[in-house]
A protein has these predicted regions:
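Extracytoplasmic/secreted envelope proteins and their assembly/folding machinery
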Residues: 1-5, 26-29, 33, 43-46, ...
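Second-shell loop/turn segments in exported
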Residues: 12-19, 30-39, 74-76, 163-170
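Structural recognition of the beta-strand scaffold that forms the well-ordered cores
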Residues: 14-16, 68-71, 96-99, 121-124, ...
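Structured C-terminal subdomain patch of bacterial secreted/periplasmic proteins
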Residues: 24-34, 43, 128-201
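Basic- and aromatic-lined ligand-binding clefts that recognize polyanionic substrates
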Residues: 40-92, 165, 197-201
Length: 201
């Protein structure tokens, strides 16, 4: 970085982006827009994303039902997503059975998962696309008691393209929120799941 900065006509401005929540992503979009002289474009993008977030929240609130959701970020060891992933589940109208918005990933014990009786399971291995994520499915389905879980019995266990929609804190995270909303509340949402983004387990 030092060598590169010496070759530039002006001293570069270094912007550190370390978002933790969805609101941080919107703030960072505006910060980058301001720093690059593209404030109007950045504000328009952030505003449009915020509109989509609010739409999901408002529609999800129409249902008194809050399904218990297990969001898995890894299978060996078993990890549940934290921070923005828990926030996404809650905005989409679910209750995260494990995970905490104030913490990062949480290591889980399989017996704890069985005891939690999740009604929706979202397998979204961090950084994996859908094809790679599917390779982790047998690790889950071979575990004792898998077939007894409510989510499995009701056909509500899914694998997601985490690389595109849940792992990276950028604009596509909002599409990830919309995907979760339809998976958690299919009676309220439709047309939210892009082709090739989700598979059944």
């Amino acid at each position: 970085m030092a060598e590169l900065s010496e070759k530039l006509p002006n001293e570069p401005q270094v912007i550190s982006l370390d978002p933790t929540y969805i609101g941080d992503v919107l703030d960072d979009i505006r910060r980058v827009g301001l720093a690059t002289g593209k404030s109007d474009e950045a504000d328009n993008l952030a505003d449009s994303l915020e509109t989509r977030i609010n739409a999901v929240r408002e529609i999800a609130l129409k249902s008194p039902d809050r399904p218990r959701v297990l969001q898995l970020e890894w299978t060996e060891p078993l990890l549940s997503g934290g921070h923005w992933v828990v926030e996404m589940v809650e905005l989409a109208g679910g209750i995260s059975v494990f995970g905490d918005k104030t913490q990062s990933s949480m290591r889980l014990d399989w017996d704890e998962i069985v005891a939690s009786q999740p009604e929706v399971i979202l397998l979204m291995p961090c950084g994996f696309d859908l094809d790679r994520a599917r390779e982790d499915i047998p690790t889950l389905t071979s575990l004792r008691g898998w077939e007894s879980l409510p989510a499995v019995q009701e056909g509500r266990a899914y694998v997601l393209d985490a690389s595109e929609y849940t792992s990276r804190l950028g604009p596509r995270l909002i599409t990830g929120l919309e995907i979760m909303a339809e998976l958690i509340h299919p009676e309220l949402f439709s047309g939210m799941v892009p082709e090739g983004s989700v598979g059944a387990i």
